[in-house]
Design a protein with these regions (language model features):
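Catalytic cores of phosphodiester-bond hydrolases, prominently lipid phosphodiesterases
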Residues: 1-178
Length: 178
């Protein structure tokens, strides 16, 4: 029992962001997801859990119509109103769109500058950044950390976890204030 209480106490201090990739029609899918989530008040009322919808999205102007526990994945090339931006949890983009072309690692200085400019613009909006469809290997993860990418997209969760632990850089475990 003591271990269970300890783990509960530890989870209170941690944040979880659940990124849901909507692949079907946005409005009906999100409406159904909201109905299901409302059955779990311990999730939707927990300020340490953020549910972010990516992929297919409803019109930006309707973001305000969704409950406070629903957030959206934004794009830098959109001109959001202040209200719409307040429902954006992060800004994501296709890695190859950011650098301008598909290229073998490592990148040249022009591509690195494009990536850094993108990341800086997102951070100026006060939002975390995620690059999707990016190289999924330690050299890329290291570069993303150096650039200030906030969320590393990966299909290799265990490898990324091992990489971060071996890197012994605890700053990536600090809770975000964003």
């Amino acid at each position: 029992m003591a271990i269970h209480r300890y783990l509960q106490q530890q989870m209170v201090l941690r944040k979880l962001q659940l990124l849901v990739d909507v692949k079907t029609e946005a409005i009906s899918t999100i409406d159904r997801l909201v109905q299901i989530l409302k059955k779990y008040p311990s999730i939707i009322q927990n300020k340490n859990i953020k549910i972010v919808l990516s992929g297919n999205a409803p019109p930006d102007s309707t973001f305000k119509n969704y409950p406070d526990f629903i957030w959206f994945d934004g794009r830098l090339n959109k001109n959001y109103t202040t209200s719409e931006l307040s429902k954006i949890a992060l800004i994501s983009e296709d890695y190859y769109k950011v650098i301008g072309y598909k290229f073998i690692w490592p990148l040249d200085s022009v591509s690195i500058d494009k990536a850094k400019q993108f990341i800086d613009k997102v951070h100026q909006l006060g939002k975390p950044v995620r690059l999707w469809a990016s190289p999924d290997k330690p050299a890329a993860w290291e570069q993303f950390m150096q650039w200030g990418v906030d969320l590393i997209n990966t299909d290799k969760i265990n490898d990324l976890a091992d990489f971060i632990i071996q890197r012994n850089d605890c700053e990536y475990f600090k809770p975000s204030n964003k």
